[in-house]
Swiss-Prot record:
This is Chromodomain-helicase-DNA-binding protein 1. Residues 268-360, 385-448 form the Chromo domain. The lineage of its organism: Eukaryota, Metazoa, Chordata, Craniata, Vertebrata. One of its GO terms (molecular function) is helicase activity. It is an enzyme of class 3 (hydrolase). It comes from Gallus gallus (Chicken).
C-alpha cells in the first residue's frame, strides 16, 4: 500500500536503510528507534534494515521500498533531517501513526468480530502488508525504542516490528480484530484517519513523515481501533507520494471524511501538559517515552544544570495516546511538528509562572505542603502507566507474533482505554496478558442451569480453611472469620438470606469474599454475583477480591456512560456463546440506580449490599429498586446495626426475606412490646438471619481503647460571638415551644459553629495579619478547643503518636488544615470532596511503612466507613455528632484489627455550651432510642425502640431544643460585654489528669453499655433522675432573664437603623452597601453566608440588609432533610418528566436522591409545583424583563430554602411533557409494546430510523426523562444502543437532533390527544353539528382549552435557529411530498383544496400547492426577504403581545412590499394575478395562515400605514360597508374597505359553497365538518367575517377586521389603483408606530377573563391570542422550525387552535402537515 512505500522511504531517509521490511520489524525499529535510538536491534537494523525488511516483507516490500526510496529522497531533501535525530526531538511523532492502516484494521476488525474475520483476512491481505507497515511505524516509534532492544534484525524492532507486522499483516487482518470497537480510546497517538491524496507535503510534514510514515500507517490502524479520539497527528499523508494505486479500503477511508480537512487531521494534538523541567538539549521526543527509557536509558540521565546548558522541556500527554507514550518536548520541537493545541502551552506557562512566583514568597511550610501535593499527583500519574486489565485484542498478529491489546489503565476509567502494541505490553505486563487469556478461555463462567440454584445442597461445616481461600499469598482467616464463613454457608444452604452485622474492623469484606469463593469452588456456582458498595470502599473491595479470590473474575462497573458502554462491550459477555464473562460485578448505589433496567435484567445468583444501613428506609428509591432485582440469595453487610427503630430492622429483614417478614404491622404487633417483656422472642426469630460480633468478644488481641472527654472554656472572642448569636435571635428564642423546630436547630448550628471556632462565624479578612506568626496566634486564640488541641498535638508529636482528627464540618477541617500547615505538621485529609483515587492514595500514604504523616483530618460522615487507619493510635473527636453511633464508627477506624498499640480517644467539648448539654442528653437518650444489638449467643442482646423515626430528624423535640439553647447562656451573660475572660492557662498534663476517663472493659456490664461506653458514664439510671431534677430548674428561667435588657435594646436599635437606611437608600447604593458589609475576601464571604442551609436570623444573616421584594413564599422548615444541592438536582430532574408528581421514583433516580423516602419526595414535589402556581398567580400582572433587554424573559421566581426556582419555566416544562405522560402506558409490559399512534415524517438521520425507533425514543424519554439521551442509549430494551449518539460526532442523531425529534414527536402526541378529545366531545351527527356548529365550537373551545394549551408551550429546549441547509432540505421534502400527494389524492367531481393534512377540501378551481419549478422560482425571488420570512412566525422571546403583533405586521409589510416590487416586471394582469398568488402561497409555508389570509392581512397593514401617515379619513367614509362596526376605533371601520363583486365571486361564490356541501355530503359524511374546520377551510366559511366559532376576531383586533366576502380584492383592482396604493405604502413606511397604542387597548378590552387567569404559565404568553380565525391544521403540529422555537408555544403568532382544528389535523398523516409547511 501507499503506507508501505512511505514507510520505507522514511526508513531509508532516516538512514536506517532498511529497505522496507514493511512487514514490521524493520519498520518497527525504523522510524524512530532504530534510526535514533537504535536500541532495539539497532546493530542489525541500521545496517541491514533493507535486508531485514526484504526478508520479512518479501517481494512486496521490495517494490514498495523502491518507490519509497525515491519518495524518500524527494521528501528528505527539504528538511534535511536525520530521521533518528528528528525522531528524538519530535515526541509527538513518538506515538507511531498508523492512521490509514488503523482505520482499515478497525473496519476489518469490526467485521471480524462478527465474522470471525476470515473474509476480512482475505480481503485485507493485500493491504495488510501496507497496513502492517503503518502499524509498525507506530510501534516502532514508541515501542521500538523500548522494546525491541535486542530483538534482532528482523523482529529486531521488537515492538515496532511487531507493531509493524501488526500493522502490516494485521493492518489488513487486524482490522478484523473482534474486539476493537471503533471509537475506543487508543493508547498511542492515533494518526489521523484520513490520508490526503494530494501528494503535496509541506516541509514540516515531510520532516515528520520521514520519521513516522511507517508509524503513521500503523497508527491508522490503531486509529481505527482507537476511535477518533485523537485525530490530529502528522500533517503528512503517507499514501500520497506513493504509488497512485488506491484500494477499496482507501476509498472507504476517505469517503466518510471531508477530504479538504485531511491535512490538519494528521497532526498530533496536545491533550495536557503534565510537567516541566530543565533538561539536556536534545533529550526530547520518542526516546523519552517510558519504554524507550527502559530500553536505552534516559537521554536526560546525569544532566546537571550547573555544568551543561539545558533547555526548558515539557512532559506532554498526547491526545488519543495513553500515558506510556508521553514524551518530553521543547517549544521548538512542538512547533517543528506542527502539533495542535499550542494554546495550552501558553496557559501552562502562565500557570507555572504564577506558581513559581507564589513559591518564591511562600513560607517553608507552604512550600513543603505544595511539594507533598505534587508528590501525590506524580504518584497518581505513575499509576496511569500501569496496565490494570486487558480487555480485548486484535485478530492479527504482528511480525513479532503479538496481537495488539486494548488496555485499561490503573486509576483511569474505562473510557480512557487504549490500543497498545502487543510486544510492548508483553514485555512489561505479561501477567496481565496471561490473566486476560485465561479469563477468555475460562470455563468457570456463570450458567443458568446450575443445580444448586434450584435445590440447595446439605450443609457441611468447614473445619479448617480451604486451600482456595487466601489467594497466592496463602492468607489465613482468623477463627471467628472462619466461623462467620460457616454461618454464611449454613444460611445459604438453608435458603435464608441474611445480615452480617459484625462490628467495624472485624473483616466483613473478607468473610463475604470467602463466602463467594466457597460457592464458586464447593458448589460450582460461578455467579453472577452482584456487590453494591459505597464508592469510598470500592477500591478496597477490588483489592481484597484480587488478594483473596484471584480465580474469580471481578469487573468494576463504574464511570461515565462511555466507560460503562465499554464494559458492556468488552467485559460483559462472550459474543459467540452469549455467556457472561464475569463472576462478580462490583458497582455503587448511584450507578445501580442509573442502570437499573440493564442490571435488573439479569438473574443474580447473589446480591450483597455493603453499608446496608442505606436500606433502612423501606420507602427510599434505592430500597424499592434493589428489592425488585431478581436474586437467588441476598446478604446485607453493615457495621452499624440499626440505629433508630424497630421499623428499620424490619426494613432490612423484609429486604432479605420478603415472604417471611411481609408485614410491618404484624412484626410490630409481635415484637413491639419487647421493652416491657424483654426481647427473647425477637432474638429467637432473628438468630437465623443476623450475625453480630463485637471486637472485644472475638479479638482478644486487640489493645484497649481509652476515651477521655476534655472540657474547655470558650475563648473571649467565642464568648462574645456566642452571646451575640443568642441576642440577635432573641425574638425566635422567646417563642419557646411555639417556635419552629428548624429555627431552633439553625440557632443551635450557629452556636455549635461558634463552639468550634470563631472563623466559622466570621472569617478574617485576607490582609488582616502582618505575618504567619500573628495569623497562627489569632487562629489558635479564636477557639478554646484549638488552644487545647494545639497543646495536645505538640505533646503527641513528641511522643511519636499518630492522630486522626474528626469533625463534622468541612469548613472546620479547612481551618485545622490551615493550622497544621502553620505548625508544619505533615497530614492527609479526607472528606466528601476528595475523590476515589486521591482518597485511596491518601490512605495508602498514611498507612505506608515509615510514613511521615502525623495527622489525618477526616469528616465524621464522609465516605469513611470501612476505611482502615489502624496505623494511627490516637483519635481526636473535635465536635461530637448528634448520633453517637457515627462517633463510634469514627473511633473504629483506628481501633480495629491490625492495631498494635493502645488507642486513646479524646473528645473535645466546650464547657457551658449547647455542645455539653447535647452530649449529656445524647448519653441518656441514645441508649433508649438506638437499637443496639448486643451479644446474645451470636446475635447479642438488643435494646429496641419500636417507633419509626424519620431519618432526617434530630433526636430532640422543641422543648428539649429550647432547654439545650438555654444551657450555659446565663453564666455567659454574667460577664459584662467586652470584658470576657480568656480561658485560664493550664498545663496539658493537668487537663488530661482531670478528664473524665474510661477504658473499655472486656464485656458490657449493663444493657446498652457498649453505646454508653463512649460517654464514660457508669450507670445511666442515675442520669435519668438527675435529668428530672435539672429540667424544671433550667427551663423555668426565660430568655428575658437570661439576656440582659441593655443588649437586647442595642440590637433592636441597630435593626431599626438598618431598616431606615434600607428605606432611604437608593437601590444601587443598597447593593454596594450590602457588598461592603459583607466584608473581605470573596471566597470566605460566600462561605460565611452559606450557613448549612440555615435561614435563622444568625449574626451574618442579620448584618445583611433585608432583601427587597416579596417575602419568601415558602418557609424553610418545609424541606427538612434536603440540602440546597439536592433541591437543585430535584428541580432539574423534575423538569424532565411529564406528570412529575406521579413519577417521583423516576425523578428521584435521575436526581440521585434514592435514599429519600417517597413521602419526603412528594412533599418537595408538591412544594415545587404549588410554589410555581402561586408565584405565577401573584405575578399575573405581567412579565418581569431582566435588565430591560428584549429576549430575556425572567418569569416570576420564588425560593425553596436557598434555591431560586423559575416558576414559569418549571410549569411550562411540566405542561409540555404532559402529552407524553398521558400517551405512554404506565404499565411496563404495555410500554414495551407501545407504538406511536401518529404517522411521522422521515428523520433523515445517518442510520435507519423508523416508527419503532420513534416509539422507543418516546418510551425512553418517559422512563429516563427528557434530555437523558445517554441513559436511553444504555437501555437494552429500547434497542437504541447502536442508533443514537454515535461515537463519530459528525454522525446523526446526536443530542441536538434527538431533542428536535423528541419535540416534534411530543407535538404529534399533543395533537393526537386533542383530536381524540375533540372526537369524544363531537358526539352528534353531521347535520346537527352543522347547524349548531358555532355554539358547539364555543363550548368545546373552552372545555378543551386546557388540553390544547400545552400545545402552545415552549418545547423543553430552545433550538438554535436552523441554518440554510436545513431550510433547503425542508423545501426538498415539501417538494417530494407534494408530488406524492398529488398522486395519492383521488379525483373528485368538484374542485378540491389539498390541506396540510392531505385531506381534499373543495374550494374553487385554484389549488394552493406549487409545482417544483414554480416553488424554486418563488424561493429565489423571495430570497432577499428570507429573514423576514423566517421571523414571521417567530417573534423574539419576551415581547409583549402588542410588540408581537407589531413584529408580525412589520414582517408582512416587508414581504408584501417585496412581492409588489417583483410584480412590477409583469404587464399582463393575468400573469400579475398568478404570480402574486404563487408568491403569497410560498409565504404561507412559513406561517399558520394561508395565502389569501396573508395577502389580506398585508393589505390591512398597508392601510394602517397609510392611515397613520396621512391622518385623513377620506377613505374610511367612502369604503364603509353595510355592516359597519360601531367601535370608537377608526381603524376598525377601515377594515371593511372597497370590495367589489368580482372579488367576492372569485373567492366565495355560492357555487363554491354548494359544491363544497355536495362534496362533503357525498364523500365524508361524519367527518365533514371537521375537515372543513381544518387549517384551510373553504373560503365561504369566512363570508361573514367570522371564524368557525362565530367569533369575529377582527372586531377584537382592528388591524385585521375585514369583510371576508371581499377577499383578494387587490387582484381585481385596476393596475392604476394598485400602483397608487403601493405609492402610499412606500410613503407611509416608518409611521407604523401609531398603531400600537390603540391596538393594545383593543386587545386587552376584548380579552376574556379566563385568558388572563392563565397568564402565568409560559404557554399563555401567546402570540396573537385573540385571532382564532383561520388557523391551518398544522398550527400546533411540529410545523416548522419557527414553531418549535417560539417560547410562546407551538401556535403561530397568529392564532389559537380550535379543538376541531386539532381533530382534523391528525386525521391523516402528520407527516404532510409538518413538511408541507416547513421550508
Amino acid at each position: 500500500m501507499n503506507g508501505h512505500s512511505d514507510e520505507e522511504s522514511v526508513r531509508n531517509s532516516s538512514g536506517e536503510s532498511r529497505s522496507d521490511d514493511d512487514s514490521g520489524s524493520a519498520s518497527g525499529s525504523g522510524s524512530g528507534s532504530s534510526s535514533g535510538s537504535s536500541s532495539d536491534g539497532s546493530s542489525s537494523q541500521s545496517g541491514s534494515s533493507d535486508s531485514e525488511s526484504g526478508s520479512e516483507s518479501g517481494s512486496q516490500s521490495e517494490s514498495e521500498s523502491d518507490t519509497s526510496r525515491e519518495k524518500k529522497q524527494v521528501q528528505a531533501k527539504p528538511p534535511k533531517a536525520d530521521g533518528s535525530e528528528f525522531w528524538k526531538s519530535s515526541p509527538s511523532i513518538l506515538a507511531v501513526q498508523r492512521s490509514a492502516v488503523l482505520k482499515k484494521q478497525q473496519q476489518q476488525q469490526k467485521a471480524a468480530s462478527s465474522d470471525s474475520g476470515s473474509e476480512e483476512d482475505s480481503s485485507s491481505s493485500e493491504d495488510s502488508a501496507d497496513d502492517s507497515s503503518s502499524e509498525t511505524k507506530k510501534k516502532k516509534h514508541k515501542d521500538e525504542d523500548w522494546q525491541m532492544s535486542g530483538s534482532g534484525s528482523v523482529s529486531g524492532t521488537g515492538s515496532d516490528s511487531e507493531s509493524e507486522e501488526d500493522g502490516d499483516k494485521s493492518s489488513c487482518e487486524e482490522s478484523e480484530s473482534d474486539y476493537e470497537p471503533k471509537n475506543k480510546v487508543k493508547s498511542r497517538k492515533p494518526p489521523s484517519r484520513i490520508k490526503p491524496k494530494s501528494g503535496k507535503k509541506s516541509t514540516g510534514q515531510k520532516k515528520r513523515q520521514l520519521d513516522s510514515s511507517e508509524e503513521e500507517e500503523d497508527d491508522d490502524e490503531d486509529y481505527d481501533k482507537r476511535g477518533s479520539r485523537r485525530q490530529a497527528t502528522v500533517n503528512v499523508s503517507y499514501k500520497e507520494a506513493e504509488e497512485t494505486k488506491t484500494d477499496s479500503d482507501d476509498l472507504l477511508e476517505v469517503c466518510g471524511e471531508d477530504v479538504p480537512q485531511t491535512e490538519e487531521d494528521e497532526f498530533e494534538t496536545i491533550e495536557k501538559f503534565m510537567d516541566s523541567r530543565i533538561g539536556r538539549k536534545g533529550a526530547t521526543g520518542a526516546s523519552t517515552t517510558i519504554y524507550a527509557v527502559e530500553v536505552d536509558g534516559d537521554p536526560n540521565a546525569g544532566f546537571e544544570k550547573s555544568k551543561e546548558l539545558g533547555e526548558i522541556q515539557y512532559l506532554i500527554k498526547w491526545k488519543g495516546w495513553s500515558h506510556i507514550h508521553n514524551t518530553w518536548e521543547t517549544e521548538e520541537t512542538l512547533k517543528q511538528q506542527n502539533v495542535k493545541g499550542m494554546k495550552k502551552l501558553d496557559n501552562y506557562k502562565k500557570k507555572d509562572q504564577e506558581t513559581k512566583r507564589w513559591l518564591k514568597n511562600a513560607s517553608p511550610e507552604d512550600v513543603e505542603y505544595y511539594n507533598c501535593q505534587q508528590e501525590l499527583t506524580d504518584d497518581l500519574h505513575k499509576q496511569y502507566q500501569i496496565v490494570e486489565r486487558i480487555i480485548a485484542h486484535s485478530n492479527q498478529k504482528s511480525a513479532a507474533g503479538y496481537p495488539d491489546y486494548y488496555c485499561k489503565w490503573q486509576g483511569l476509567p474505562y473510557s480512557e482505554c487504549s490500543w497498545e502494541d502487543g510486544a510492548l505490553i508483553a514485555k512489561k505486563f505479561q501477567a496481565r496478558i496471561d490473566e486476560y487469556f485465561s479469563r477468555n478461555q475460562s470455563k468457570t463462567t456463570p450458567f443458568k442451569d446450575c443445580k444448586v440454584l434450584k435445590q440447595r445442597p446439605r450443609f457441611v461445616a468447614l473445619k479448617k480453611q480451604p486451600s482456595y481461600i487466601g489467594g497466592h499469598e496463602s492468607l489465613e482467616l482468623r477463627d471467628y472469620q472462619l466461623n462467620g464463613l460457616n454461618w454464611l454457608a449454613h444460611s445459604w444452604c438453608k435458603g435464608n438470606s441474611c445480615i452480617l452485622a459484625d462490628e467495624m474492623g472485624l473483616g466483613k469484606t473478607i468473610q463475604t469474599i470467602s463466602f463467594l469463593n466457597y460457592l464458586f469452588h464447593e458448589h460450582q456456582l460461578y455467579g453472577p454475583f452482584l456487590l453494591v458498595v459505597p464508592l469510598s470502599t470500592l477500591t478496597s473491595w477490588q483489592r481484597e477480591i484480587q488478594t483473596w479470590a484471584p480465580q474469580m473474575n471481578a469487573v468494576v462497573y463504574l464511570g461515565d456512560i462511555t466507560s460503562r458502554n465499554m464494559i458492556r462491550t468488552h467485559e460483559w459477555m462472550h459474543p459467540q456463546t452469549k455467556r457472561l464473562k464475569f463472576n462478580i460485578l462490583l458497582t455503587t448505589y448511584e450507578i445501580l440506580l442509573k442502570d437499573k433496567s440493564f442490571l435488573g435484567g439479569l438473574n443474580w445468583a447473589f446480591i450483597g449490599v455493603d453499608e446496608a444501613h442505606r436500606l433502612k428506609n423501606d420507602d427510599s428509591l434505592l430500597y424499592k429498586t434493589l428489592i425488585d432485582f431478581k436474586s437467588n440469595h441476598r446478604l446485607l453487610i453493615t457495621g452499624t446495626p440499626l440505629q433508630n427503630s424497630l421499623k428499620e430492622l424490619w426494613s432490612l429483614l423484609h429486604f432479605i426475606m420478603p415472604e417471611k417478614f411481609s408485614s410491618w404491622e404484624d412484626f410490630e404487633e409481635e415484637h413491639g412490646k419487647g421493652r416491657e417483656y424483654g426481647y427473647a422472642s425477637l432474638h429467637k426469630e432473628l438468630e437465623p438471619f443476623l450475625l453480630r460480633r463485637v471486637k472485644k468478644d472475638v479479638e482478644k488481641s486487640l489493645p484497649a481503647k481509652v476515651e477521655q472527654i476534655l472540657r474547655m472554656e470558650m475563648s473571649a472572642l467565642q464568648k462574645q460571638y456566642y452571646k451575640w448569636i443568642l441576642t440577635r435571635n432573641y425574638k425566635a428564642l422567646s417563642k419557646g415551644s411555639k417556635g419552629s423546630t428548624s429555627g431552633f436547630l439553625n440557632i443551635m448550628m450557629e452556636l455549635k459553629k461558634c463552639c468550634n471556632h470563631c472563623y466559622l462565624i466570621k472569617p478574617p479578612d485576607d490582609n488582616e495579619f502582618y505575618n504567619k506568626q500573628e495569623a497562627l496566634q489569632h487562629l489558635i486564640r479564636s477557639s478554646g478547643k484549638l488552644i487545647l488541641l494545639d497543646k495536645l498535638l505538640i505533646r503527641l508529636r513528641e511522643r511519636g503518636n499518630r492522630v486522626l482528627i474528626f469533625s463534622q464540618m468541612v469548613r472546620m477541617l479547612d481551618i485545622l488544615a490551615e493550622y497544621l500547615k502553620y505548625r508544619q505538621f505533615p497530614f492527609q485529609r479526607l472528606d466528601g470532596s476528595i475523590k476515589g483515587e486521591l482518597r485511596k492514595q491518601a490512605l495508602d500514604h498514611f498507612n505506608a511503612e515509615g510514613s511521615e504523616d502525623f495527622c489525618f483530618l477526616l469528616s465524621t460522615r464522609a465516605g469513611g466507613l470501612g476505611i482502615n487507619l489502624a496505623s494511627a493510635d490516637t483519635v481526636v473527636i473535635f465536635d461530637s455528632d448528634w448520633n453517637p453511633q457515627n462517633d463510634l464508627q469514627a473511633q473504629a477506624r483506628a481501633h480495629r484489627i491490625g492495631q498494635k498499640k493502645q488507642v486513646n480517644i479524646y473528645r473535645l467539648v466546650t464547657k457551658g455550651s449547647v455542645e455539653e448539654d447535647i452530649l449529656e442528653r445524647a448519653k441518656k437518650k441514645m441508649v433508649l432510642d438506638h437499637l443496639v444489638i448486643q451479644r446474645m449467643d451470636t446475635t447479642g442482646k438488643t435494646v429496641l425502640h419500636t417507633g419509626s423515626t424519620p431519618s432526617s430528624s434530630t433526636p430532640f423535640n422543641k422543648e428539649e431544643l429550647s432547654a439545650i439553647l438555654k444551657f450555659g447562656a446565663e453564666e455567659l451573660f454574667k460577664e459584662p460585654e467586652g470584658e470576657e475572660q480568656e480561658p485560664q492557662e493550664m498545663d496539658i498534663d493537668e487537663i488530661l489528669k482531670r478528664a473524665e476517663t474510661r477504658e473499655n472493659e472486656p464485656g458490657p456490664l449493663t444493657v446498652g453499655d457498649e453505646l454508653l461506653s463512649q460517654f464514660k458514664v457508669a450507670n445511666f439510671s442515675n442520669m435519668d433522675e438527675d435529668d428530672i431534677e435539672l429540667e424544671p430548674e433550667r427551663n423555668s428561667r426565660n430568655w428575658e432573664e437570661i439576656i440582659p435588657e441593655s443588649q437586647r435594646r442595642r440590637i433592636e436599635e441597630e435593626e431599626r437603623q438598618k431598616e431606615l437606611e434600607e428605606i432611604y437608600m437608593l437601590p444601587r447604593m443598597r447593593n454596594c452597601a450590602k457588598q461592603i458589609s459583607f466584608n473581605g475576601s470573596e471566597g470566605r464571604r460566600s462561605r460565611s453566608r452559606r450557613y448549612s442551609g440555615s435561614d435563622s436570623d444568625s449574626i451574618t444573616e442579620r448584618k445583611r440588609p433585608k432583601k427587597r421584594g416579596r417575602p419568601r413564599t415558602i418557609p424553610r422548615e418545609n424541606i427538612k432533610g434536603f440540602s440546597d444541592a439536592e433541591i437543585r438536582r430535584f428541580i432539574k430532574s423534575y423538569k424532565k418528566f411529564g406528570g412529575p408528581l406521579e413519577r417521583l421514583d423516576a425523578v428521584a433516580r435521575d436526581a440521585e436522591l434514592v435514599d429519600k423516602s417517597e413521602t419526603d419526595l412528594r412533599r418537595l414535589g408538591e412544594l415545587v409545583h404549588n410554589g410555581c402556581i402561586k408565584a405565577l398567580k401573584d405575578n399575573s400582572s405581567g412579565q418581569e424583563r431582566a435588565g430591560g433587554r428584549l429576549g430575556k424573559v425572567k418569569g416570576p421566581t420564588f425560593r425553596i430554602s436557598g434555591v431560586q426556582v423559575n416558576a414559569k419555566l418549571v410549569i411550562s416544562h411540566e405542561e409540555e411533557l404532559a402529552p407524553l405522560h398521558k400517551s405512554i402506558p404506565s404499565d411496563p409490559e404495555e410500554r414495551k409494546r407501545y407504538v406511536i399512534p401518529c404517522h411521522t415524517k422521515a428523520a433523515h438521520f445517518d442510520i435507519d430510523w423508523g416508527k419503532e425507533d420513534d416509539s422507543n425514543l418516546l418510551v425512553g424519554i418517559y422512563e429516563y426523562g427528557y434530555g437523558s439521551w445517554e441513559m436511553i442509549k444504555m437501555d437494552p430494551d429500547l434497542s437504541l444502543t447502536q442508533k443514537i449518539l454515535p461515537d463519530d460526532p459528525d454522525k446523526k442523531p446526536q443530542a441536538k437532533q434527538l431533542q428536535t425529534r423528541a419535540d416534534y414527536l411530543i407535538k404529534l402526541l399533543n395533537k393526537d390527544l386533542a383530536r381524540k378529545e375533540a372526537q369524544r366531545l363531537a358526539g352528534a351527527g353531521n347535520s346537527k353539528r352543522r347547524k349548531t356548529r358555532n355554539k358547539k365550537n364555543k363550548m368545546k373551545a373552552s372545555k378543551i382549552k386546557e388540553e390544547i394549551k400545552s400545545d402552545s408551550s415552549p418545547q423543553p429546549s430552545e433550538k438554535s435557529d436552523e441554518d440554510d441547509d436545513e431550510e433547503d432540505n425542508k423545501v426538498n421534502e415539501i417538494k417530494s411530498e407534494n408530488k406524492e400527494k398529488s398522486k395519492k389524492i383521488p379525483l373528485l367531481d368538484t374542485p378540491v383544496h389539498i390541506t396540510a393534512t392531505s385531506e381534499p377540501v373543495p374550494i374553487s378551481e385554484e389549488s394552493e400547492e406549487l409545482d417544483q419549478k414554480t416553488f424554486s422560482v418563488c424561493k429565489e425571488r423571495m430570497r432577499p426577504v428570507k429573514a423576514a420570512l423566517k421571523q414571521l412566525d417567530r417573534p423574539e422571546k419576551g415581547l409583549s403581545e402588542r410588540e408581537q403583533l407589531e413584529h408580525t405586521r412589520q414582517c408582512l409589510i416587508k414581504i408584501g412590499d417585496h412581492i409588489t416590487e417583483c410584480l412590477k416586471e409583469y404587464t399582463n394582469p393575468e400573469q400579475i394575478k398568478q404570480w402574486r398568488k404563487n408568491l403569497w402561497i410560498f409565504v404561507s409555508k412559513f406561517t399558520e395562515f394561508d395565502a389569501r389570509k396573508l395577502h389580506k392581512l398585508y393589505k390591512h397593514a398597508i392601510k394602517k400605514r397609510q392611515e397613520s401617515q396621512q391622518h385623513n379619513d377620506q377613505n374610511i367614509s367612502s369604503n364603509v360597508n353595510t355592516h359597519v362596526i360601531r367601535n370608537p376605533d377608526v381603524e376598525r371601520l377601515k377594515e371593511t374597505t372597497n370590495h367589489d363583486d368580482s372579488s367576492r365571486d372569485s373567492y366565495s361564490s355560492d357555487r363554491h359553497l354548494s359544491q363544497y356541501h355536495d362534496h362533503h355530503k357525498d364523500r365524508h359524511q361524519g367527518d365533514a365538518y371537521k375537515k372543513s374546520d381544518s387549517r384551510k377551510r373553504p373560503y365561504s366559511a369566512f363570508s361573514n367575517g367570522k371564524d368557525h366559532r362565530d367569533w369575529d376576531h377582527y372586531k377584537q383586533d382592528s388591524r385585521y377586521y375585514s369583510d371576508s366576502k371581499h377577499r383578494k380584492l387587490d387582484d381585481h383592482r385596476s393596475r392604476d389603483h394598485r400602483s397608487n396604493l403601493e405609492g402610499n405604502l412606500k410613503d407611509s413606511r416608518g409611521h407604523s408606530d401609531h398603531r400600537s397604542h390603540s391596538d393594545h387597548r383593543i386587545h386587552s378590552d376584548h380579552r376574556s377573563t379566563s385568558e388572563y387567569s392563565h397568564h402565568k404559565s409560559s404557554r399563555d404568553y401567546r402570540y396573537h391570542s385573540d385571532w382564532q380565525m383561520d388557523h391551518r391544521a398544522s398550527g400546533s403540529g411540529p410545523r416548522s422550525p419557527l414553531d418549535q422555537r417560539s417560547p410562546y408555544g407551538s401556535r403561530s403568532p397568529l392564532g389559537h387552535r380550535s379543538p376541531f382544528e386539532h381533530s382534523s389535523d391528525h386525521k391523516s398523516t402528520p407527516e404532510h402537515t409538518w413538511s408541507s409547511r416547513k421550508t
